[in-house]
Amino acid sequence: MEIFSASASLTLTGFVPRLLPLLSPQARTTLCKPLLSSSSTRLISCHSRIAPSRSLADQSASTGISVVDSDPIDVVKRKAMDIAPELKGASIFLVGINNSIKTNTGKLLAEALRYYYFDSDNLITEAAGGNVSAQALKEADEKAFQESETEVLKQLSSMGRLVVCAGDGAVQSLRNLALLRHGISIWIDVPLDITAKGDDDSFHSEPSPELFDTLKASYEKSRKGYETADVSISLEKIATKLEFEDLEAVTSEDIALEILKEIEKLTRVKKMMEEASRPF
């Protein structure tokens, strides 16, 4: 896959040609596989207190899926296949503060639904030529950077069968929020203290006050946009529902299954509304 380098004065005109190769069918195949192994994906740490039989058993009461001796990922995949016909290839956009929980859940959903997976921030970075060039563009021309975020969403929203981890730029303008309406938007609501601790390697270290303050400011700036999502998935609510005392016990399978159940509710409501609007 060819990645074009970017100049320091990258503009929207220069950005679009760099973006399109990343969204070609060949690039989509390259970027999206393999997503996950067949083993259970832990959200936070291999030391998390996991009770998979209990959590999945609790959820099986409402899904109708037998989870005895089942691989948790297989349970998610079966649920995904159950709702896929009603989903009709609609793309799924995950919003919320970027963290490994959101990323892992997005990849699991893509695998379960047999969708392509994209991270919109990564696409912008790759199209710009790397983190340094992307940051230089943002600092030199904030408007051009925002336009690049919109262009990414415009391209992605025109496609189907995608799971997209969207950056905060996706919820900070009315135009971008409108583009999310081309699919189903899901807010992955993770407590800031967990997000601040970072990925697995640094999860047990305490975040710096400066980092926490930065995340809090970003969260407050984007919160109203998050709240417009079709579905809100709270890590704390899932832990409470599954009777976990520690948020670390929640897995990506738990979150993905909850998302699929909420999507199923949305498709049922939509179907009922369509049937009610038909003339006698």
From Swiss-Prot:
Subcellular locations according to the entry: Plastid, Chloroplast
A Pfam family matched in the record: SKI
SUPFAM superfamilies from the UniProt entry: P-loop containing nucleoside triphosphate hydrolases
Domain of life assignment: Eukaryota
Keyword Transit peptide recorded: yes
PANTHER family named among the record's database cross-references: INACTIVE SHIKIMATE KINASE LIKE 1, CHLOROPLASTIC-RELATED (PTHR21087:SF4), SHIKIMATE KINASE (PTHR21087)
Protein's recorded name: Probable inactive shikimate kinase like 1, chloroplastic
Species: Arabidopsis thaliana (Mouse-ear cress)
Lineage, highest ranks first: Eukaryota, Viridiplantae, Streptophyta, Embryophyta, Tracheophyta
Gene responsible for this protein: SKL1
